[in-house]
A protein has these predicted regions:
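Membrane-spanning alpha-helical segments of multipass transporters and channels
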Residues: 1-192
Length: 192
């Protein structure tokens, strides 16, 4: 789901160009208006992933509805996070999303138990969204344990707030810097 969100920000423009029909659109309106596209495509991706896991791969799942719900929540969080990074930092945000993905794949406990990973991963893995998404999905597959599933989804909700802060607040001071970087890239005739 993270890779799908990353591909979305790579192939769909996040910048909303001025429109004659809506000249007074506020930055937050542009942010949410464009994000709807990312959200809908991400939800289709989550549905296809969940249905593929359940009916094509035929995983054993104690609660298919909660499995889909966890996929949908992960997709929402991941697409919003990627979108916010890209809105705030443009190409640097995309690169940052790739770096975060690599760190999470290596050290979020999905490949190997976190206890056998290097100490640095043991210290930082809980600051990333992957472990909470994986734990929520694991709960629906292996059986529910108390409120762990809902706790994981709640923690993923914190990343929604972080994403909104990045995309709506932190993006403001970076607009001029992003314009300078974009202008510099255009002058170089090398980069897209």
């Amino acid at each position: 789901l993270w890779v799908g969100a990353l591909i979305l920000v790579a192939i769909i423009h996040v910048k909303v160009l001025p429109d004659e029909k809506i000249p007074d659109a506020k930055p937050y309106q542009k942010f949410f208006g464009r994000y709807i596209t990312f959200f809908l495509i991400g939800q289709v991706q989550a549905l296809i992933t969940a249905l593929g896991d359940l009916f094509y791969i035929k995983i054993q799942c104690h609660n298919p509805f909660l499995f889909w719900l966890a996929c949908a929540c992960c997709s929402f969080v991941f697409t919003l996070f990627m979108y916010a990074l890209t809105v705030a930092f443009e190409n640097v945000g995309e690169a940052l999303a790739v770096v975060i993905m690599v760190i999470q794949v290596a050290g979020a406990g999905g490949s190997f138990p976190i206890e056998v990973l290097p100490a640095i991963y043991q210290r930082i893995y809980r600051f990333f969204p992957f472990p909470y998404g994986m734990d929520a999905l694991r709960e629906t597959i292996g059986g529910m344990y108390g409120m762990t599933y809902w706790k994981c989804l709640g923690i993923l909700g914190i990343y929604i707030i972080i994403s909104l802060l990045i995309g709506l607040v932190i993006a403001i001071p970076f607009r001029k810097l992003n314009m300078k970087i974009e202008h510099s890239k255009e002058k170089s005739d090398i980069m897209l």
